[in-house]
């Protein structure tokens, strides 16, 4: 799961230990729903409490990300709303910041691409969004 969190028309990205940036998120644990997992991952990586509001997209990683893996992976992008918290350094991320679409930092392309982030911006601005899926 990957969380799309907006503030002032900017999207939240977290900086990983390797210096690359991504939407907060991670593997979905077998005992958690997609909704519960995205809430947990945002708390772990960004220190924020969120409400999951809308599914933006359900995408096949092999079709949409350059980094390939031996496993078939489905990525679920969720539009979320912040309800509390603040960033705390942790084991997975060293920082967080909000970015405009035309000013994205160097991304972790196996986790999210500029096109996927643009899709999140599009969903954020749409009154009636239809989930994109492969």
Where are these regions (language model features)?
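Unchanged
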Residues: 28-52, 60-120, 129-134
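Conserved N-terminal beta-strand and adjoining loop/helix that marks the start
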Residues: 1-11
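Thr-Gly-centered strand-to-loop micro-motif
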Residues: 23-25
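Short loop/turn segments immediately following the C-termini of beta-strands
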Residues: 16
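A conserved beta-turn-beta hairpin within the catalytic core of GNAT-like acetyltransferases
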Residues: 19-21
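Aromatic-lined ligand-binding clefts that engage carbohydrates, nucleic acids, or primary amines
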Residues: 125
